[in-house]
Design a protein with these regions (language model features):
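N-terminal small/polar loop signature for handling phosphorylated ligands or for N-terminal nucleophile
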Residues: 87-150, 247-308
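Short acidic, glycine/serine/threonine-rich loops at helix termini
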Residues: 97-102, 127-131, 149-155, 176, ...
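Glycine-rich phosphate-binding loop plus the immediately following alpha-helix
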Residues: 156-187, 323-347, 351-362, 417
Length: 561
């Protein structure tokens, strides 16, 4: 049965259908486009799990799609020989607690112990719990920094990383055999809890997570107690763990943005709660004008990304980009560990193919091996796992990606904004001891290594036709590689969807241009959009910015269907 109207009618005819789902289905009766959009496909399950708009239908996040995915996960676990235990967390999004509870019910009905945090917690705390509790998998109900209408379902492996492509394919194969109404086993929550099949994660687990982050300190902490901070959790999960960490560090001058302090799935002050964008940080910046802190820190709803602003020397505050902070922290960690004699032999730093090329000369200066992975922090986590398997986990010193994700230890296997808070505070305090800010730090690095400018252009393609348009655009780009982009000769093209790159195949095109500039095209794995990453380098800020502006215009032209 694949006719959208048939699916719609079958859903509507279900006895005991969830009230909210039923009301939505009734409201779209006779609206062919609305019915088609909800039923023309199943939500795609991949290495990022599920992510979609909350609502009714097979192409939405709801009780039934979550239960179906969990039944597939349970079937996979029961056939795999992995521990029959799963850690579960959720963030502040709508239906987060409900979806986490339904996940636990399905797992319990399949003989798998569900370990649930008693309240909303950060994604890195979920990665920690998987390893800490010896679980076979983990589930985090989150849509990260997407708008309020979204929710998601991230699956983690026993190593605390988001699942590999191989695991995702096996889970998907199991999911595809399941009818969301007829084939899902479902336990009574209270009965399963009484039987020990659903358990609450002990507070010690979270306390030990915060301690593990604290143990990632790089320097001696001199001057850190003098730091003055403004912090915003963007109505998400970060407040508890970040405040606990700051207290351990001795950072007591902390002002929390009041409108964004409490969890709120509507994200009323910022429709797109992403610390990468100014709009999300605007309330924090306004508070900075009154409080005049040394740092503004913002974490996204599931507290795995961290944004920063610092005084600009002109009475205002400047946002530091994810690439800039990655370079600042890489340089700080390397110079500090060398000075203190704590740098391991054969140190390794890891970044992604869409992150700044500036990492290469910085790593080279300090004798650090730089590894590049595909987009997604799970690939950085995999590199930590490889070093661990070799018996040399201490070689890993830092990993970052351009989208504001950082990690300096192996305590978790995903980006960690609590860890980022520690590193940013340490680096800011170290520079403050010299009368400098983090802005001074990145400017000095630009002067030394060149002015690297990176930008991200996103092009949305909504609905069923949008997915087709995205596929056709990528096909066209592969068939007809441009000879030049923005007037810069295309010197080479790397298609990551082929063998020979040294990385797993991925739907990414990379154009290397004359002058050391670069443009990369990548369809998002979680949203209906194509992302174009721009990279320019020049001997001045103005020169690099001019190239980036030209590349941005060229990218827009390339995306026209």
């Amino acid at each position: 049965m694949n006719n959208t109207n048939d699916l719609y009618n079958r859903w509507l005819a279900q006895p005991d259908l969830d009230d909210a789902v039923k009301a939505e289905l009734v409201s779209i009766a006779g609206d062919a486009d609305a019915v088609t959009d909800r039923f023309y496909r199943d939500l795609e399950f991949g290495t990022g799990g599920l992510r979609g708009v909350i609502g009714a239908g097979t192409n939405r996040m709801n009780l039934y799609t979550v239960r179906k995915a969990t039944q597939g996960l349970a079937d996979y676990l029961n056939a795999s020989g992995l521990p029959k235990k799963v850690a579960i967390a959720h963030d502040s999004r709508h239906n987060g607690a409900l979806f986490a509870r339904e996940t636990a019910r399905v797992l319990a009905a399949n003989g798998i112990t569900a370990c649930m945090y008693p309240r909303l917690e950060p994604t890195p705390a979920l990665s920690w719990a998987v390893r800490y509790l010896g679980c076979g998998a983990g589930v985090c109900v989150t849509a990260s920094h997407n708008p309020a209408k979204y929710n998601g379902y991230k699956v983690y492996g026993a190593d605390g990383c988001q699942i590999t492509l191989e695991a995702a394919e096996k889970i998907l194969a199991a999911i595809e055999k399941i009818d969301c109404f007829d084939d899902v086993r479902l336990a009574d929550f209270d009965a399963a809890a009484a039987a020990g099949r659903i358990v609450t994660i002990d507070e010690k687990c979270l306390d030990d997570f915060v301690q593990a982050v604290y143990d990632q300190r790089v320097g001696d902490g001199a001057g850190i107690d003098a730091l003055k901070l403004v912090y915003t959790p963007l109505n998400g999960t970060g407040l508890e763990c970040v405040k606990k960490l700051l207290k351990k560090l001795g950072v007591t001058h902390v002002t929390v943005v009041p409108e964004q302090e409490k969890p709120d799935g509507d994200f009323p002050t910022c429709p797109y709660p992403n610390p990468e964008i100014r709009e999300a940080m605007q309330k924090g910046l306004e508070l900075c004008d009154k409080v005049r802190p040394d740092l503004l820190l913002g974490t996204d709803p599931d507290c795995d990304r961290c944004g920063t602003a610092v005084p600009d020397g002109k009475g205002g505050y400047r946002l530091i980009t994810g690439n800039e902070m990655g370079i600042i922290l890489l340089d700080y960690i390397c110079r500090t560990r060398l000075a203190q004699g704590t740098m391991p032999a054969d140190p390794v730093a890891v970044t992604t193919i869409v992150s700044t090329d500036m990492a290469a000369p910085v790593a080279k200066k300090y004798g650090v091996e730089l590894r590049r992975t595909l987009t997604g922090f799970k690939f950085i986590g995999e590199q930590i796992g490889k070093l661990e398997a070799e018996g040399r986990p201490e070689r890993y010193i830092f990993g970052f990606e351009e989208s504001y994700g950082y990690l300096s230890g192996g305590h978790v296997r995903d980006k960690d904004a609590v860890n980022a808070t520690l590193l940013v505070c340490e680096a800011a305090a170290w520079y403050a001891q010299q009368g400098k800010t983090l802005l001074d730090a990145i400017e000095a690095l630009y002067r030394k290594f060149g002015y690297y400018r990176n930008a991200l252009c996103s092009f949305a393609f909504e609905g069923e036709s949008g997915m087709h348009t995205m596929q056709e655009l990528m096909k066209k780009l592969r068939a007809n590689a441009p000879e030049d982009i923005a007037g810069y000769k295309v010197e080479s093209v790397v298609d990551y969807d082929t063998d020979g790159t040294g990385l797993p195949r991925a739907n990414v095109l990379e154009y290397h241009l004359d002058g050391g500039h670069k443009l990369m095209v990548r369809p998002s794995g979680t949203e209906p959009k194509i992302k174009v990453y721009l990279s320019a380098v020049g001997d001045s800020e103005a020169a690099a910015d001019a190239v980036n502006a030209a590349l941005a215009k060229a990218a827009a032209d390339m995306m026209k269907a």
